[in-house]
Regions:
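A generic structural micro-feature
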Residues: 28, 67-69, 83-85, 105-109
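A generic structural motif
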Residues: 54, 93-97, 118-120
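N-terminal helix initiation/capping motif
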Residues: 1-66, 128-139
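Short beta-strand-centered aromatic/proline hotspots
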Residues: 47-50, 88-96
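Short, solvent-exposed secondary-structure boundary/capping segments
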Residues: 58-62, 97-115
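Short conserved beta-strand and strand-loop elements enriched in small hydrophobics
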Residues: 35-40, 71-87
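Short, conserved charged micro-motifs
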Residues: 67-71, 122-125
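Short, charged, solvent-exposed linker or helix-capping segments at domain edges/interfaces
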Residues: 102-103, 123-129
């Protein structure tokens, strides 16, 4: 099959490739309530909206005017109108792709999948708390 054909694109598009993604995940994912955000360090992408989370990673959406150049090594999770803040989680980007581009191409909405590194006991406790109180249920 030619690589440019429609069925090949659907099958190999990261958005549609759920089977491989599910096989790589070790922990159950949970949908996150509105108002939870992620900030990377170092970052050239600003703040992103948290979509789902597990004990070993998360997915977020963010808006950018360019392809990310800096690979973050840590992230913070915070919730608006809440004192909750989980800081300094070690991380690495698993995937990052465009989900929408403006007509003029100046901005794009991107989705990034992140895997956590080794967490401290305190970070694990706070992450468990976040999943318990700031998610709406399993994906």
């Amino acid at each position: 099959m030619v690589h440019g054909s429609w069925p090949y694109y659907i099958r190999n598009n990261p958005i549609n490739n759920k089977d491989n993604e599910a096989e790589r995940r070790n922990e159950k994912r949970f949908l996150v309530q509105e108002g939870a955000f992620v900030m990377f360090r170092p970052s050239d992408t600003g703040v992103g909206r948290l979509i789902d989370i597990s004990m070993d990673g998360l997915t977020l959406d963010y808006v950018s005017s360019k392809e990310p150049e800096v690979q973050p090594t840590e992230l913070d999770i915070f919730v608006v109108n809440s004192p909750f803040r989980l800081q300094g989680l070690p991380c690495r980007t698993i995937n990052d792709f465009v989900t929408f581009t403006t007509y003029d191409g100046a901005l794009s909405k991107r989705r990034r999948g992140v895997q956590f590194g080794e967490l401290t006991k305190n970070q694990e406790l706070l992450l468990t708390h976040f999943i318990q109180y700031h998610t709406t249920g399993p994906v």
